[in-house]
Structures are given as structure tokens and as C-alpha cells.
């Protein structure tokens, strides 16, 4: 998160947090509630400013010994903002219910007593709501940032030559090396792929968000590129263009990473002498409308597949999973994507699915598979029921 996007995120979450707190103070009939709301608002403002300062000036202290402490402080600030913001719908409903009860018609002492007793019972239960929400958010932030799961996929294809049965592709995506995950996390992810005996590593975009960490990423790739028999291949994501795409490109090339941009290459596996398959990758499409995106996706896919030998098994790297459709139409065997982060929150999946037809995991159209990586990293560390992911694809012949 950077620039105006970060500012907008902080304004919305901070504003929602203050409204949530104000609603809870109203429900509780808190004494001096205006003073409490003011203090809460000031604390929230300080937290929002602190998070923005951390993210926007990270480059100036990322190599200091106290950086981990600042990272934990920023995560605690996000915990506060996200927790109280998430309570806003419940706070609004609760305020409406209490308002109606307080201002509705009263008929006698018995009803007043009943309302007061019900309110006290409600308040005792309501206290647990912010506490519970805070615990869930804290878990989502800490677990989401600390844990990465290795998913192993065994995929069978009619188009894969029998001599290539057992070929292994490691897949990482959306690392977002930056204020919450560093180059050391990238290194550990690559080590995990190596330990699974992958022949090749593919990276489907959004590598780094903090340009000050790009040299460290380069050092990681330079050290580990030779550990893959058939190399490392990379396609651009949208975040490469949000920052300094040329800087990232230069780093990757100098480190021995192969960049494919609407082009492909014949791979001759070292472990399978005399065999070959085709790896291609598309650029990211910034088309604004669905129709324009579909046309550009089809165009980029055709460009990427130019020069593909007839009937050769083909793997396509595309940051956005909606490239699956033109790839399947073009007879690609396997599409590897990312971009969606899997929705990050399991209960947000139905909403995220409205935007992304292919949200996470494995999909199939005819003889074409598409796998959408949930993200090996993230720019917002909150994850619940949708952990970070490293994927190991083992290819088999039907």
C-alpha cells in the first residue's frame, strides 16, 4: 500500500473505527461519552499517522536493528484499525435497536424495568464482541504474516509426453517484498521449492513493493538461481508497473532470472534428455473494461505463443487468472497465475468471486488446467482461512 491508496485506506478504516466506538459508547450509555469519543479519535488518528509514516518512509530505516519492532508496531496499529472498522456494521445495527427501545413508547414501570434489564444483559454480551473481533484480527495478522503452506498438485495431461512424466514446477506469486515481508522470506520460499526437487521455478508477478529491497532480492536470486536445473522464469504483475519496472527488470536479468513478456521459449529439461516443452508468459493488462481486457488478453496470449512448435506441451504464466480463457482456447496445457491472493479472508470469498472468476486453486476447461496461487506474500498481512502459499506442480501423463 502506497500513496493515495494508503491514505484512502487509512481514512476509511480510521473513520469507521471512530464511528464504531461512538456507537458502542452510545449503546453503553457511557458517562462522558463525548470525551471518550474524542480520546478514541485522537488515539486512532495517531495510529493511522504512524502506519502511514512507517509505510511511506520505510526506505529510510529498513536496515536498522529496530526494524522488526517498528513492523510489529505497524501490525498492532493495523489490528486496531481493522478490528474497530470490522465492527461497524454490528455497531450500526446495535445502535438502531437500542435507539428504538429507548425512544419507543413506554407503558408502565414494568416495561422500563424490562428494558433496563435487557440492556444490561445485552451490554454484558456486547463487551465480548470487540474482544472477540480483536482476537480474530490479531490471529489473522500474525498467522497470515508468519505462516506459508506448501501445496502439492499432481496434474495429469494427455498432451504431456510420457518421457516427461514426473517433471516438477515450483510456483510462487505475489511475494510483495516490502514492509511486512523481506528478501529473507523470499529466500525461504525458494529454499522450500528447492527442497521439493523442482526442475524449474516460475514466479507470476508482484515480486517487490519496496524498491530499497530490490538489491537484496537480487542477491537472493543470484545465490539460488543455479539450484534449478531448468532455471527461473518470471512474468510481470501490476505491481511491477506501480513502482520501477525497469529497476526490477535489470535486477532480475543480472541475477539470472529469465523474464518472459508476451513471448515464449522452448525448454529442454536437463533431467529428461531429448525432451522439450514450451513455456510462455503474458504481460499484465491494465484495460479498464471487461471487453477491452478480453481483447487484450487474447492479443497478449497470441503474441506469447508465437513460435510455439506444433502440438508441443505448453505452460503459460499470466499474473491475472482471467488469461485462462484465451489460453484454453489456444490449446495451452497449463496456466499458472496469481494476483487474487485467494481473497485473503475465507468469508470474503463470495464477494471476491464476483470480481474474479478464478479466485484460488485448480480449475479446468477441457484439457487445460489453470492454477491460481493464493500468494506467497501480501501487501496487507491479514489472512484468515487463506494462508500464504508455495505450490509444487508435478506433471504426469494420462
Where are the regions that the model predicts?
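Generic short alpha-helical hydrophobic face used as a protein-protein interaction/packing hotspot
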Residues: 81-84, 126-127, 159, 197, ...
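Generic structural microfeature
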Residues: 72-75, 117, 150, 358, ...
Amino acid at each position: 500500500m502506497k500513496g493515495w491508496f494508503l491514505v484512502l485506506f487509512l481514512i476509511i478504516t480510521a473513520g469507521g473505527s471512530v464511528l464504531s466506538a461512538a456507537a458502542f459508547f452510545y449503546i453503553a450509555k457511557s458517562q462522558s461519552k463525548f470525551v471518550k469519543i474524542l480520546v478514541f479519535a485522537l488515539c486512532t488518528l495517531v495510529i493511522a499517522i504512524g502506519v502511514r509514516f512507517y509505510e511511506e518512509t520505510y526506505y529510510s530505516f529498513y536496515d536498522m536493528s529496530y526494524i522488526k519492532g517498528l513492523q510489529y508496531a505497524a501490525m498492532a496499529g493495523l489490528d486496531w484499525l481493522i478490528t474497530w472498522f470490522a465492527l461497524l456494521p454490528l455497531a450500526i445495527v446495535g445502535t438502531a435497536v437500542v435507539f428504538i427501545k429507548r425512544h419507543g413508547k413506554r407503558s408502565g414501570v414494568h416495561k422500563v424495568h424490562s428494558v433496563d434489564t435487557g440492556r444490561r444483559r445485552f451490554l454484558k454480551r456486547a463487551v465480548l464482541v470487540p474482544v472477540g473481533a480483536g482476537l480474530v484480527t490479531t490471529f489473522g495478522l500474525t498467522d497470515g504474516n508468519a505462516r506459508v503452506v506448501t501445496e502439492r498438485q499432481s496434474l495429469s495431461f494427455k498432451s504431456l509426453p510420457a518421457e516427461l512424466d514426473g517433471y516438477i514446477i515450483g510456483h510462487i506469486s505475489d511475494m510483495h517484498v516490502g514492509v511486512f515481508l523481506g528478501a529473507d522470506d523470499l529466500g525461504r520460499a525458494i529454499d522450500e521449492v528447492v527442497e521439493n526437487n523442482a526442475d524449474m521455478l516460475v514466479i507470476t508477478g508482484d515480486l517487490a513493493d519496496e524498491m530499497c529491497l530490490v538489491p537484496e532480492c537480487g542477491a537472493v536470486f543470484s545465490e539460488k538461481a543455479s539450484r534449478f536445473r531448468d532455471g527461473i522464469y518470471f512474468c510481470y504483475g501490476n505491481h511491477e508497473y506501480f513502482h520501477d519496472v525497469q529497476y526490477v527488470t535489470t535486477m532480475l536479468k543480472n541475477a539470472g532470472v529469465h523474464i518472459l513478456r508476451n513471448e515464449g521459449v522452448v525448454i529442454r529439461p536437463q533431467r529428461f534428455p531429448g525432451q522439450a516443452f514450451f513455456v510462455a508468459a503474458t504481460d499484465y493488462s491494465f484495460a479498464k473494461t471487461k471487453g477491452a481486457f478480453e481483447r487484450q488478453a487474447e492479443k497478449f496470449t497470441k503474441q506469447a505463443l508465437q513460435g510455439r512448435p506444433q502440438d508441443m506441451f505448453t505452460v503459460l504464466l499470466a499474473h491475472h487468472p482471467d488469461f485462462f480463457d484465451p489460453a484454453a482456447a489456444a490449446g495451452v496445457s497449463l496456466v499458472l497465475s496469481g494476483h487474487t491472493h485467494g481473497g485473503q479472508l475465507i468469508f470474503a470469498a463470495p464477494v471476491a468471486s464476483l470480481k474474479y472468476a478464478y479466485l484460488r486453486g485448480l480449475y479446468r476447461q477441457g484439457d487445460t488446467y489453470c492454477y491460481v496461487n493464493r500468494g506467497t506474500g501480501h501487501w496487507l498481512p491479514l489472512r484468515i482461512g487463506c494462508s500464504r502459499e508455495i505450490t509444487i506442480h508435478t506433471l504426469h501423463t494420462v
